[in-house]
Amino acid sequence: MPTINQLVRKGRRSQSSKSKAPALNYGYNSMKKSQVNNPAPQKRGVATRVGTMTPKKPNSALRKYARVRLSNLIEVTAYIPGIGHNLQEHSVVLIRGGRVKDLPGVRYHVIRGALDTAGVTDRKQSRSKYGTKKPKK
């Protein structure tokens, strides 16, 4: 615990919080070949690998994921939500922040229904989250 004199001299420093989706905080300046601070809610990227991985201990499944090289040249792992997908290598995808609790190292989600990613077929509820159009009557 600091003394009164130490507090008078230095004061309290407020803690800075770490970003939960750090790859969305940067842009890339190709002229200077450097990262620039350019925060964005989503980023576009190209899928370099699409596959499945198994979740942490109490759960059991084959979760679909894509390794994505973003427009700022950072490579991240993104989860593909919903049942079935049409992604393959070199597909252009849009990602957003949001981790998957039982997949270590997965901090991003692929946005369904944007760019090359198709929406989930035959989905009736929560359609907006999965990029599905309203079904015809």
UniProtKB/Swiss-Prot annotation:
Superkingdom, taxonomy of origin: Bacteria
Record keywords, A-Z: Methylation, Ribonucleoprotein, Ribosomal protein, RNA-binding, rRNA-binding, tRNA-binding
GO-annotated molecular function: rRNA binding; structural constituent of ribosome; tRNA binding
Residues annotated with 3-methylthioaspartic acid modification: 102
CDD domains assigned: Ribosomal_S12
A cellular component term, taken from the record's GO annotations: small ribosomal subunit
Renumbered residue ranges of the record's region Disordered: 1-24
InterPro entries: NA-bd_OB-fold (IPR012340), Ribosomal_uS12 (IPR006032), Ribosomal_uS12_bac (IPR005679)
Segments passing through the bilayer: none
Family matches, as Pfam families: Ribosom_S12_S23 (PF00164)
GO terms of biological process kind: translation
Functional summary from the UniProt entry: With S4 and S5 plays an important role in translational accuracy.
Subunit comment: Part of the 30S ribosomal subunit. Contacts proteins S8 and S17. May interact with IF1 in the 30S initiation complex.
Family that this chain belongs to: Belongs to the universal ribosomal protein uS12 family.
PANTHER family associated with the record: 30S RIBOSOMAL PROTEIN S12 FAMILY MEMBER
UniProt name for this protein: Small ribosomal subunit protein uS12
Source species of the chain: Pediococcus pentosaceus (strain ATCC 25745 / CCUG 21536 / LMG 10740 / 183-1w)
Organism lineage: Bacteria, Bacillati, Bacillota, Bacilli, Lactobacillales
